[in-house]
């Protein structure tokens, strides 16, 4: 087998076009990516919101998915189950884009530090190089709109996708860090209960990104 990773539009080093970054656009991009590389079907792996996208592809294009690996996401009733203070503040904010952009310029470093400490259990991983790379990403031109799109996409997730989690029949592995401070372990166990052909794997000494903290187990 081969492993392919991609940065979605608006993420990482990918282009940040002036689009709405709607869930349907992200789904179409992923299917277009598979089409361009002539991949008829594949096993999908997604972390957090990326897990939500993998679920969306599975529900809308079931024949393109062989198996599903969901890491730390994504449940129904996101806001009710979210325990991260930093994520909650970002998702509940109704500030306009210009104000978010100004806040990112003024306080972005503090926010980055807070978010990283919530998603990572082992803080020794948060080296100066990691923090600087994260700060470089948040300073990239055009980053605000895709960040705000995550907030705006939640209603679509709750109405169009989350209610159908129990209809997924693909073999699914759900991986969860035992010290996840974004979505607690119980949230992962509930997701496991809803997806019938799923297995649940607990990762010790890991938070919201166990693939980074415990690559030996994931």
Regions found by a protein language model. Give the residues of each.
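Conserved alpha/beta-hydrolase catalytic His-Asp/Glu region
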Residues: 79-82, 103-167
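Acidic catalytic loop of the alpha/beta-hydrolase fold
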Residues: 154-155, 178-183
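Short beta-strand/loop motif that positions the catalytic acidic residue
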Residues: 168, 174-176, 180
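Post-His helix in hydrolase/transferase enzymes
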Residues: 187, 196, 212-218
């Amino acid at each position: 087998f081969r492993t392919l990773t991609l940065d979605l539009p608006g993420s990482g080093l990918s282009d940040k076009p002036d689009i709405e970054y709607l869930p349907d656009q992200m789904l179409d991009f992923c299917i277009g990516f598979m089409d361009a590389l002539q991949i008829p079907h594949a096993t999908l792996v997604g972390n957090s919101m990326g897990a939500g996208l993998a679920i969306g592809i599975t529900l809308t294009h079931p024949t393109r998915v062989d198996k599903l690996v969901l890491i730390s996401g994504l449940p129904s009733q996101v806001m009710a189950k979210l325990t991260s203070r930093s994520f909650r503040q970002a998702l509940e904010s109704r500030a306009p884009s210009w104000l978010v952009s100004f806040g990112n310029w003024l306080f972005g470093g503090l926010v980055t530090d807070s978010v990283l400490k919530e998603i990572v259990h082992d803080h020794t991983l948060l080296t100066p190089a990691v923090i600087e790379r994260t700060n470089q990403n948040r300073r990239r031109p055009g980053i605000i709109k895709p960040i705000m799109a995550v907030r705006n996409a939640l209603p679509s997730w709750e109405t169009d996708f989350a209610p159908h989690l129990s209809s997924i029949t693909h073999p699914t592995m759900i991986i969860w860090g035992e010290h996840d401070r974004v979505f607690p372990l119980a949230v992962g166990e509930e997701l496991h209960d809803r997806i019938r052909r799923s297995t649940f794997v607990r990762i010790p000494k890991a938070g919201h990104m166990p693939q980074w903290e415990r690559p030996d187990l994931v």
